[in-house]
């Protein structure tokens, strides 16, 4: 028997289309690994010899006469718009490495935002 459910006006069937909690956990673990590897790889590119890992956001904030949080939010917006466009593209099928790049970069900006917010609360 097919079971249907409705989300935001769309009708979906669960038959043959589900993911287990173990599979979600594996996706999570792989994504965290991708995020960590990317953050490590890009540290030198974005900080040079500056020991402040958040220095690029502070420099961008100074250039834009704003806060590091807002500077980061502007950079994150580009990735979110790209993901949004990918999600709503009618005919396009994107390779997994494109999804990985966009999702990983977006998550890393959120991790860096957390570091900026945390730094602001400790200073």
Write out the residue ranges for each language-model feature.
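Targeting/processing segments of secretory and organellar proteins
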Residues: 1-3, 7-8
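Intrinsically disordered, low-complexity regulatory regions
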Residues: 8-123
């Amino acid at each position: 028997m097919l079971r249907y459910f409705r989300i935001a006006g769309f009708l979906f069937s669960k038959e043959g289309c589900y993911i287990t909690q173990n599979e979600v956990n594996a996706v999570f673990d792989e994504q965290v690994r991708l995020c960590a590897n990317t953050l490590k790889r890009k540290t030198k590119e974005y900080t040079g010899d500056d020991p402040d890992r958040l220095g690029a956001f502070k420099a961008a904030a100074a250039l834009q006469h704003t806060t590091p949080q807002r500077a980061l939010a502007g950079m994150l917006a580009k990735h979110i718009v790209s993901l949004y466009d990918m999600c709503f593209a009618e005919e396009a099928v994107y390779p997994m490495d494109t999804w990985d790049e966009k999702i990983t970069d977006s998550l890393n900006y959120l991790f860096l935002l957390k570091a900026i917010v945390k730094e602001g609360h400790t200073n």
